[in-house]
Amino acid sequence: MVSYRALEVDPGGPDYSDDEVDRIFRALADATRRDILRRTLAGESTVSELADRYDMSFAAVRKHVNVLEEAGLITDHRIGRERRIRGDLRAIRGAQRLLDAFEDIWRARVDRLDALLAED
């Protein structure tokens, strides 16, 4: 198995373990979680405010929020008794750098294949 450290993501960027990458992609694999992430990047919300926007229980929305938190894609803070959730733009950029590294690998492979085909 190839380590994500070997992808040479951005030297100044995050250093992902296999488990961290799994959590990020698992979180982003669900449409509801992507929508929650979009909403919390646009502005802070409570879980109750988020739950009002979906045709599912508060507990189900809470589980989606937990998955996003475990992936590091959203953070929370308290204002009095209220727990406010917001998307973490730095984490999103880190995930983008990881995807960019994968793209670079595949582009290099295609370029090598093109070069081999051009030799014939």
Predicted regions and their residues:
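Amphipathic alpha-helical dimerization/coiled-coil segments
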Residues: 1-20, 38, 93-120
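N-terminal helix-turn-helix DNA-binding core of bacterial DNA-binding proteins
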Residues: 19-59, 79-97
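Short, hydrophobic-biased segments on the C-terminal half of alpha helices
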Residues: 65-66
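Glycine-centered, phosphate/nucleic-acid-interacting loop/turn motifs that mediate DNA/RNA or nucleotide
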Residues: 72
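Short beta-strand "wing" residues that participate in macromolecule-binding interfaces
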Residues: 76
